[in-house]
Amino acid sequence: MTNKKQLQKLELIWIGKGEEPKLEPRILIENPEYSYGDPNCENMLIHGDNLLALKALEQDYAGKVKCIYIDPPYNTGNAFEHYDDNLEHSIWLNLIFQRIKILYSLMSKDGAFCIHLDDQEVHYAKVVCDEIFGRNNFISTIAIKSSTPSGVKTSHKDKKIIKQKDLLLVYKKSDELRINPQYVRKSEWDTHFNYFINSDNKTVSSFLEVLKKNRILTQKQSIRDFDINNEVHRDFYIKNADKICQTQSHKNIELKEASRKLKDEILHTENAMFYNGRQLTPLSNSLNNVVYRDKIEKDFALLLCDFWSDIDFQNTQNEGGVEFPNSKKPEFLIQRILALFTETGDLVLDSFLGSGTTAAIAHKMGRRYIGIELGDHAKTHCYPRLKAVVDGEQGGISKAVNWQGGGGFKFYTLAPSLLKQDKFGNWVISQEYNADMLAAAMAKQEGFKYQPHESSYWKQGQSSEQDFIFTTTQFLTIEALDSIKDEMQPGETLMICCKSFQKECKGKYANITIKKIPQMLLGRCEYGKEDYSLNIINLPVEREDEEAEDAIENTSVQAISDSKKKNDQPSLF
């Protein structure tokens, strides 16, 4: 149990907190068979455990991701039906906490983080995010209408409130974030717009009378019959947006008095119009880009706030050309999020890629992206969907953003663990590593950027302009060391990682450090672990006897995750 004297801040405590594993920083290996399109593109589709993949990205992408959107599995309770509630929530929180900590490190200072949840865990998740980001960096909880109260959902309406929403927690990393305001189309005509500026630009008429005169409405109809969704009506108000006006009060007393003196004539100033003591505001001031019938165009709009009720969740089955029942998010939802927080060329990341929606939208919007998916969906869903995007598919937001195809992506897998135990239990370098993979892995382990020099074989990676690393599986002799030293320039330093070396090499040169592998790696991190997702079948079943509470308290979350798994058992993350 946590010592009360050690608690120095308000925080959420759960079983397993503080037991986070030391993750091995893996290298990523491109699989050309599943890469597609422009070979020089920067877009990445990663197949592998998302916690290990995030760790693999940390060195090269820390502080570079502009927008992170994740849609982790909701802790619905279905997966944990037979298990102790305290353990259930602890496991979910432990998994999400580890991932968000790395995601935070990947965010740029002007970046945004969005996590999509329902109300089962959102309040716990907010406390976790408050701890990682700081409460002062919380932006909003956005409620998104995701369903309608009908069918089976309403069968228990006498026992519970029917769920109709999802929730989006939004955080920033610092005050450098700038939000691009977005707008939504009004659902009906605003009857305050009841004036129409005549062609003389001096007088006004009743908007209703103008509509009747132009046979938009009949003589018996009222302004409430003006239908914003009628194409004829819509064309009329868009065409005449500078003439259709509403009146508003104004603080400038002199202008109000001057306007009253004109009596039924418009007073024009440099920046405004006044009529009978009130300011005339044209409809054109309320036109903004909105999504309308799968297009983005100017229309009568309201500022988008924290309740989104206009996105269709019911007809996403055909988007992207892949099936993903009950879990696929609408393309227009992701488009809105990326429009709020990113610009063309910004880097977007989704570590729970699912069917590939976030990557597909980022691609169509001209953003760079990294998508991570653990399961077979990486090949069966994400790959074909992104391939279709490159080829110019026209579903989802394609017409709205005038997507014509192009670009590309590269498909990566995580390298196996660098060290494995032999039959005697000793840690040895995995035989799956060739010389290049080993050099790249050691560079990552030591914080160097793997970038082999064209002419100097021993300059395999560097951490600064004059600091280099060299990895070899050969026995390092004094002659080889002297040869390298002769090539080094003044001020250069070198780390050599090798399996063994001649004893005279040790300490011979002050600017050359020699380390033995694998000994130098032991104890640094957890080797041989390929999956940090949660197997939901093998959790300890809730016990009804009086020892249950003690059993739960002494259960390690890591031990649960490490329990024996079967290939056909689902994982939560």
Sequence positions of predicted segments:
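PRPP-dependent phosphoribosyltransferase catalytic core
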Residues: 370-573
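Flexible, glycine/threonine-enriched loop-and-boundary segments that flank and lead into catalytic domains
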Residues: 41, 48-51, 56, 146-147, ...
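DnaQ-like (DEDDh/DEDDy) 3′-5′ exonuclease domain used for proofreading
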Residues: 1-67, 76-98, 276, 498-501, ...
